Amino acid sequence: MTIDKINEIFKENWKNKLTKYEIARIISARALQLSMGALPLIDTSNLKSDDVISIAEEELKRGVLPITIRRIYPNGQVELISVRKIENR
C-alpha cells in the first residue's frame, strides 16, 4: 500500500470522527477558556457538576463549540474540520 492509499483509508474512516487526542485537546482548551472567565455556551444550572471540565465536556457533547480541528497528514495535506459537524460527540 502506498502512503496516499493509507491516507485515503484514514480520511474515509475518520472524516466525521474525533480521535481521543483531539477530544482531550478540545476539552482542555475550552476548560482553560472557561477558567479564565469565558461565558459558558450552555445553561449550566441543570448540570450535575459546575466545574469547568464538566461544562466543556457537555458543550462538546451538545455540539455548540465554535472550534475547528486542523489535521495534517503525512503527505503534507491539511484538512480543517468543524467540531460542530462531527458525529461522535
UniProtKB/Swiss-Prot annotation:
Pfam families: RNA_pol_Rpb6. It is found in: Cytoplasm. GO terms for molecular function: DNA binding; DNA-directed RNA polymerase activity. GO terms for cellular component: cytoplasm; DNA-directed RNA polymerase complex. It catalyses: RNA(n) + a ribonucleoside 5'-triphosphate = RNA(n+1) + diphosphate. Its EC number is 2.7.7.6. One of its GO terms (biological process) is transcription by RNA polymerase II. Keywords: Cytoplasm, DNA-directed RNA polymerase, Nucleotidyltransferase, Transcription, Transferase. DNA-dependent RNA polymerase (RNAP) catalyzes the transcription of DNA into RNA using the four ribonucleoside triphosphates as substrates. Reconstitution experiments show this subunit is required for basic activity. Part of the 13-subunit RNA polymerase complex. Belongs to the archaeal Rpo6/eukaryotic RPB6 RNA polymerase subunit family. This is DNA-directed RNA polymerase subunit Rpo6.
